[in-house]
A protein has these predicted regions:
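Conserved short secondary-structure transition element at the edge of the structured enzyme core
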Residues: 3-6, 22-24, 33-93
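A generic structural signal for secondary-structure junctions
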Residues: 16-17, 89-92, 109
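A short, mixed-charge helix-start or loop-turn motif at secondary-structure junctions
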Residues: 28-30
Length: 118
């Protein structure tokens, strides 16, 4: 199985805020309309206290996916060399501890189609 969009269009990088803005030609300017941005930030913020020491939310997201034995590869975004290096390092660390994985599963978010997503 190939896991795609592991950072939930960027919300699981931990860098989005309610003030995040993008250039008009950037697809995120229409994807992260206020309603979606608010929900995405709220869900990501709820995960921040769970980030392991010396880790990042992006690393935690990748390692969470690695807990699934059916996943053979993950396709994360890599706009910069540092992203490639960080993603590779996350993979080298392997899956998250079972206790943390179980805690993260409690944060599952089922996105329902809404007006902005049609």
């Amino acid at each position: 199985m190939i896991a795609r969009v592991p950072f939930d269009e960027g919300s699981l990088t931990g860098t989005l805020t309610l003030d995040s803005k993008w250039p008009k030609e950037d697809w995120r300017s229409t994807y992260f309309v206020p309603e979606n941005l608010r929900l995405s930030v709220e869900h990501a913020d709820a995960l921040k206290p769970l980030i392991p020491a010396n880790s990042t939310m992006a690393e935690m997201a990748l390692r969470f996916i690695l807990n699934n034995p059916d996943v053979s590869t993950i396709i994360p975004g890599m706009r910069k060399i540092r992203n490639v290096e960080a993603n590779t390092a996350a993979s080298d660390k392997g899956p998250l501890p079972g206790e943390l994985h179980a805690e993260l599963r409690k944060h599952r978010w089922e996105r329902k189609p809404t007006k902005w997503s049609q």
